[in-house]
């Protein structure tokens, strides 16, 4: 007589072990359909664009013809053009003016007050001229300290503070200047001062680390209260901001339509739903109208990378991640059948987006670029998988070994390389090869991103179960406390900014627009991770920034 299994026993025989998945329980998007439907007002936008073109001619004459014989006045106007976000309209004129000023620098560098000397130093240094910081020795007393009389010159102190941030390694004079100015500006900001708002914002985030478009938006309200402001320049800045904002709104609406069709938020609920924040990130890398194509493809690929990150970081099992990594490396739609159901929409979207990019690049005669985009995405998966191995094996690597993987996996290399895909003829194979090999400026940016990210998310990641972070690795290897580790990391971040500054000094290893992609990316990182992880945990900071960039036009 055969033995028949009971229903319960039969169920035990055929059921598979339940898969235990880690999830971070990310909060949903705070934006809903806020940006989904944008109605273009073509007539109004055309009228604004015509006014911009007219004002550009007026400002060009004011700054580069009428002020050409007064270098101090012209430098101030150039600084205002840059801070108001319209320097991209006058790049060649600014370069020519600064070259002329640099040629006479040795003749005039001993003259001028603190404001003008610091402004001249900052603008020349920022544009690659390796001018000496010895020019500031004149502001020291016989004891080698900065003169106490400088403290009451708040505009001069603020100018000196901004200049000190362009220091490179070994510039003790500027290190002392930064301590001196920061201390006294913080004290001044606590008191009633006409410059209080400007000082408070500068101490929180100096110009070097400020996202161009956000900085421009904030500076407009400061600039219009100055006694000697240029009405034409201010009007140009406001109109230009609104014209570009309209363009960004249209782009964001198009991206959201694509994102909604993918239905990622429902099909992959384990991943962060942050498409609006990601577009903000990319607009920080390049906001200019000429980079429409670049923003389009980079936003799509950073969305795909964010989902990939959350798969490798938490939701995917190790066995699934092995299959996914192999599939991405093979880059073949036939791999779909081997993937778990939830991974398939992600994988086909990755292939489709790269196909879309390749089609457009072929039309442009730049099809060679797709190789770099594809390879950098493959490499991103390999880096994520290396971290998954650490977690699977319960491994806490040595700090150097951790950084070799994690400094690149953080995503800066991928974003920097792919950002070149959407640029013009200034980009050749050389620039792709150069960035792919992670030169000093990119290594510095990667270090800043990785360490700031790990500091900002340390407690959250520990609570949910996560691969060892740089903080864990350093504490484990050197036997120091969490706070000691963070202090050491903050010093490394400071040194990495000096590396970035050095890379802008002439002769540069790559065209300045390429360096600017990395710098702008690092500025976004500083904004989002200085006070916690504002990208993952969207709060007032991110909401206010997105409203300023994409919702509220500047009042004219």
From Swiss-Prot:
Gene3D superfamilies associated with the record: Farnesyl Diphosphate Synthase, Terpene synthase, N-terminal domain
Q: Which residues bind Mg(2+) 3?
A: 453, 461
What are the UniProt keywords, alphabetically?
Cytoplasm, Lyase, Magnesium, Manganese, Metal-binding
- Cofactor section: Mg(2+); Mn(2+)
| MF annotations from Gene Ontology | magnesium ion binding; pinene synthase activity
* Tissue specificity of this protein: Expressed in ripe fruits and roots. Not detected in vegetative tissues.
Kindly list the positions annotated as binding Mg(2+) 2.
309, 313
Known pathway: Secondary metabolite biosynthesis; terpenoid biosynthesis
As annotated in the record, motif DDXXD motif runs over: 309-313
User: Pfam families given for it?
Assistant: Terpene_synth (PF01397), Terpene_synth_C (PF03936)
Role this protein plays:
Monoterpene synthase catalyzing the production of (-)-alpha-pinene, beta-phellandrene and beta-myrcene as the major products. Unable to use farnesyl diphosphate as substrate. Exclusively expressed in the fruit of wild strawberries. Not detected in cultivated varieties.
Its UniProt domain note says: The Asp-Asp-Xaa-Xaa-Asp/Glu (DDXXD/E) motif is important for the catalytic activity, presumably through binding to Mg(2+).
What this protein is called in its record is (-)-alpha-pinene synthase
Organism from which the protein derives: Fragaria vesca (Woodland strawberry)
What lineage does UniProt assign to this protein's organism? Answer: Eukaryota, Viridiplantae, Streptophyta, Embryophyta, Tracheophyta
């Amino acid at each position: 007589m055969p033995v028949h299994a009971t229903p319960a026993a039969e169920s035990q025989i055929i059921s598979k072990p339940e898969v235990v998945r880690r999830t971070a329980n990310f909060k949903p998007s705070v934006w809903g359909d806020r940006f989904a439907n944008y109605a273009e007002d073509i007539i109004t936008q055309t009228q604004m664009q015509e006014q911009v073109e007219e004002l550009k001619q007026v400002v060009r004459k004011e700054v580069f013809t009428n002020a050409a014989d007064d270098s101090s006045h012209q430098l101030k106007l150039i600084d205002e053009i840059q801070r108001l976000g319209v320097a991209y309209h006058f790049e060649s004129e600014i370069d020519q003016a600064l070259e002329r000023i640099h040629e006479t620098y040795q003749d005039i560098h001993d003259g001028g007050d603190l404001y003008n000397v610091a402004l001249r130093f900052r603008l020349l240094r920022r544009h690659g001229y390796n001018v000496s910081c010895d020019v500031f020795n004149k502001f020291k007393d016989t004891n080698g300290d900065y003169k106490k009389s400088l403290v009451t010159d708040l505009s001069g102190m603020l100018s000196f503070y901004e200049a000190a941030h362009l220091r490179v390694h070994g510039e003790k004079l500027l290190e002392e200047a930064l301590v001196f100015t920061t201390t006294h500006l913080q004290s001044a900001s606590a008191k009633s001062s006409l410059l209080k708002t400007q000082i408070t914002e500068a101490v929180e985030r100096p110009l070097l680390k400020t996202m161009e478009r956000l900085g421009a938006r904030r500076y407009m309200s400061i600039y219009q209260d100055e006694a000697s402001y240029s009405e034409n320049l201010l009007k140009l800045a406001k109109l230009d901001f609104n014209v570009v904002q309209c363009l960004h709104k249209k782009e964001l609406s198009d991206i959201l339509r694509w994102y909604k069709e993918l239905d990622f938020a429902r099909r992959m609920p384990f991943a962060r739903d942050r498409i609006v924040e990601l577009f903000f990130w990319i607009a920080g890398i390049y906001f200019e109208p000429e980079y429409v194509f670049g923003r389009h493809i980079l936003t799509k690929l950073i969305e795909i990378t964010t989902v990939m990150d959350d798969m490798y970081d938490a939701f995917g099992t190790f066995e699934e991640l092995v299959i996914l990594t192999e599939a991405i490396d093979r880059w073949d739609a036939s791999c779909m059948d081997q993937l778990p159901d939830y991974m398939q929409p992600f994988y086909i979207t990755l292939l489709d987006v790269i196909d879309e990019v390749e089609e457009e690049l072929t039309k442009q005669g730049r099809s060679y670029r797709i190789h770099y985009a594809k390879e950098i995405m493959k490499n991103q998966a390999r880096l994520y998988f290396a971290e998954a191995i650490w977690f699977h094996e319960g491994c806490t690597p040595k700090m150097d070994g951790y950084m070799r993987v994690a400094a690149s996996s953080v995503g800066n290399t991928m974003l920097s390389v792919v950002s070149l895909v959407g640029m013009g003829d200034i980009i050749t194979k050389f620039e792709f090869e150069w960035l792919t090999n992670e030169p000093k400026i990119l290594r510095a940016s990667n270090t800043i991103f990785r360490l700031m990210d790990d500091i900002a998310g340390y407690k959250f990641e520990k609570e949910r179960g996560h691969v060892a972070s740089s903080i864990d690795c350093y504490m484990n290897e050197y036997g120091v406390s969490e706070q000691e580790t963070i202090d050491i990391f903050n010093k490394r971040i400071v040194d990495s900014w000096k590396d970035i500054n050095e890379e802008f000094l002439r002769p540069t290893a790559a065209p300045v627009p390429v360096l600017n992609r990395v710098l702008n990316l690092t500025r976004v990182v500083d904004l989002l991770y200085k006070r916690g992880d504002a990208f993952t945990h969207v709060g007032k900071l991110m909401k206010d920034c997105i409203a300023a960039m994409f919702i509220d036009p500047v009042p004219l």
